[in-house]
A protein has these predicted regions:
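Bacterial N-terminal signal peptides that target proteins for export
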Residues: 1-11
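Bacterial N-terminal signal peptides
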Residues: 10-20
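Histidine-centered catalytic micro-motifs
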Residues: 126-130
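Glycine-rich nucleophile elbow surrounding the catalytic serine of serine-hydrolase chemistry
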Residues: 132-137
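Cys-dependent protein tyrosine phosphatase-like superfamily
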Residues: 22-124, 139-185
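Intrinsic disorder/low-complexity segments
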Residues: 3, 21-22
Length: 185
């Protein structure tokens, strides 16, 4: 079996493992209901990931109360400037590194990794449309920056929502694998 096929098989195994999570794997993070945020998941004290901000009026104060210092938007889009204004008005930093699901351009990943690795930004909330890009980007950070194995980072990403619950999830898994394999130290 070649390296790419082995990696795909390992990631598929990780997805299956995440689907039958044990109590010990539940310590990886915690899904929390945050008003105005779709699929909020607290990874640890420095980072949370999630899907779209569905209500700025509810989400921004809730994120502020949770101590979030920086919001990283991986979706971008038409609402990004209004979201930026609300986040910055609340005294938080707002960064956009839009990753397009059609073009799959990896260019936003390097600046994302820099921002997501900067303790001055912590705690950070990383979000995208459904949370898949956020979990995928965090998986890349865990492997490329933190030195985790793909398998360990994949389990965490699957727990955070990078699962086959929509058509884009397999695309993001492949995007993460390709980026990791071309940037792994």
């Amino acid at each position: 079996m070649n390296r790419a096929a082995s990696t795909r098989a390992a990631v598929l195994f990780v997805v299956v493992l995440a689907g039958v999570a044990t109590p010990s794997s539940a310590q990886l993070g915690q899904r929390i209901t945050v008003p105005g945020v779709n699929n909020f998941w607290r990874v640890d004290k420095t980072v949370s990931t999630g899907g779209s901000i569905t209500s700025r009026e509810m989400a921004v104060p809730a994120l502020k109360r949770r101590g979030i210092r920086t919001v990283i938007d991986l979706a971008g889009g038409a609402d990004a400037e209004r979201e930026r204004a609300a986040v910055e008005a609340a005294g938080m930093k707002y960064l956009v590194f839009a990753i397009n699901g059609t073009t799959l351009d990896p260019a936003p990943i390097d600046p994302f990794l820099k921002a997501a690795s900067d303790p001055a930004n912590y705690p950070v909330f990383i979000h995208s449309g459904a949370g898949h890009r956020a979990a995928m980007a965090w998986m890349i950070k865990r492997v490329v920056v933190d030195g985790w194995t793909i398998e360990k980072a994949g389990i965490e990403a699957a727990s955070a929502g990078l699962i086959d619950d929509n058509a884009m999830a397999p695309v993001w898994w492949k995007f993460a694998q390709d980026y990791i394999m071309s940037h792994k130290k």
